[in-house]
Amino acid sequence: MRKVLLTLTILLTSYATIFAQGIEIAFALPVGNYQLSDNTAKMLRSKFLPAMTESGVETAEVSTIAIKPEISFVNKQVVEGGMRNIHTSDIQFNFICTNLATNTTFASCVVTVRGEGFSDDDAIKNAISKLSAQDKRLTDFVNKAKDKIIDYYQHNLNSVISRARTFANIQQYGEGLALLFSCPATISGYTKVNNEITTIYRQYQTQECNNVIQKARTEFSNGNFDAAVEYLQQIDMTSSC
């Protein structure tokens, strides 16, 4: 939870720059019955990102909205070779654009490519190498996702803000901020999102400040004056407390 809040704190300090340019979408790690190697996962991400850029979508390392690729094998065969067997299969890539906080799905796209190699991972790599960022199926998918995201938040903005407030009221500030950060800056009424982000973050600041002060008081009452001072030095100077 603290890690989430730290990430959101960093985002908050620069959200005007980040979101002024439009929609940001992350590319999540692939999922499926087969565990990809790190290199193969990175290869798929690198192959797909140009399709997002081509469609005017900014990519992000961290975002509530993400494209989740699911990989499965169709018509899988293992052909005996000389020294090593050759794995061949139709590799099915199911790309899903979703809000990770609400599980709202905006768009999906299935692309099937033939792959082969000396292992399942090699077969997937071979299939990935055949993917093209200019593939109309991929660019149409990203464009559809972009339009659906804008439409969703435009029509559900008040509901999103209300849900964020509900999270804040039960002190789940990270979840509340994550919802608000997923709103594109291009929608009308985004000023309300900006204001709510500031309000919830200040609530979080106040809670953290009070917690630190309580710890400092405990250390002080126990005679641990240096420890008390160290706690007080952790207080955000912009906090209201």
Regions found by a protein language model. Give the residues of each.
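N-terminal segment of the mature soluble domain
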Residues: 21-70
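Charged, low-complexity, helix/coiled-coil-prone segments
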Residues: 34-40, 64-80, 118-125, 171-177
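C-terminal/domain-edge helix-coil "capping" segments
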Residues: 106-107, 111-237
